[in-house]
A protein has these predicted regions:
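Conserved glycine-rich Rossmann-like NAD(P)H-binding loop of the short-chain dehydrogenase/reductase
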Residues: 24-40
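Canonical Rossmann dinucleotide-binding motif of NAD(H)/NADP(H)-dependent dehydrogenases/reductases
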Residues: 1-29
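Conserved Rossmann-fold cofactor-binding substructure of NAD(P)-dependent oxidoreductases
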Residues: 56-74
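Rossmann-fold cofactor-recognition segment
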Residues: 45-60
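A glycine-rich helix->loop->beta "capping" turn
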Residues: 46-47, 68-80, 86-92
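C-terminal helical subdomain
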Residues: 62, 178, 193-240, 246
């Protein structure tokens, strides 16, 4: 049995991944941003161990999520599934004065990666839109640029890939991977999304628990079990990760 913590698992792909992991006999801890959603998540995934509560828009609450997770003991895998902010028409500021999309998609997985006891595997959900992300890493918090919602989302998804690469460089004993779930019919993707929803959550589950040779590698991009090539290429992503995380 593998023990897995999944952020953003109260609905969507995170909940689907949790349900599949429980069906396979693994231990799962859920995450939701508030108590109401947490209870809904437990009802939807009754085999889960428990649910951790905290809004990833908030730095303080994100740190609180890490504290709650650490009190539950070691995990074999952490899936950074939570995401938000696709095409936000205006910049929504958090209590910390940061853009909502940056706080949830970039800063939260960074903080959780730094604070949660190191698992054997780390999985980061990116997007095909990472290819349009700004690789300069300038103005991460959109303090100087006019707001562009889709660009902000693309930037954040490139950041997720870079975090995965930076972790792989710093922690060679951890399997660190990023994946693209495809354009699927979730709240973010919309009802007209063309890709296979039933396949979208399976890649993160596979990366979390499989002993297949292809799943036990690091700094690789995946979508629906098929390898994809990052916009900047593997060597370039590794280079770009250095200024972002200092490794």
């Amino acid at each position: 049995m593998v023990r897995v913590f999944i952020t953003g698992s109260s609905d969507g792909l995170g909940r689907m991944a949790a349900q599949l992991l429980v069906e396979q006999g693994h231990g799962v801890v859920l995450h939701a941003r508030n108590e109401r959603r947490g209870q809904e998540a437990l009802a939807a995934v009754p085999g889960a161990e428990t649910v951790v509560i905290g809004d990833l828009m908030s730095i303080a609450q994100t740190r609180g999520v890490a504290d709650q997770v650490n009190r539950l003991g070691l995990f074999d895998a952490v899936i950074h599934n939570a995401g938000a902010g696709y095409r936000e028409p205006r910049c929504i500021a958090t209590e910390d004065g940061l853009p909502h999309v940056f706080a949830v998609n970039t800063l939260a997985p960074y903080i959780l990666t730094a604070l949660i006891q190191r698992p054997k595997r780390l999985i980061y959900l990116s997007s095909g839109l990472h290819r349009s992300g700004d690789a300069s890493l300038k103005d991460l918090a959109w303090e100087n640029r006019p707001w562009q919602g889709q660009q902000a989302y693309s930037d954040s998804k490139l950041h997720d890939v870079l975090i995965a690469f930076a972790v792989a460089r710093r922690w060679p004993d951890v399997l660190s991977n990023a994946l693209e779930p495809g354009w699927v019919a979730t709240k973010t993707g919309g009802p007209g999304a063309p890709d296979d929803l039933d396949a979208a959550h399976r890649t993160q589950v596979w990366l979390a628990v499989s002993d297949a040779p292809a799943a036990t590698v690091t700094v690789t991009g995946w979508t629906h079990i098929y390898c994809w090539t990052a916009m900047c290429g593997l060597k370039s992503c590794g280079r770009l990760a250095k200024p972002m995380i200092g490794v």
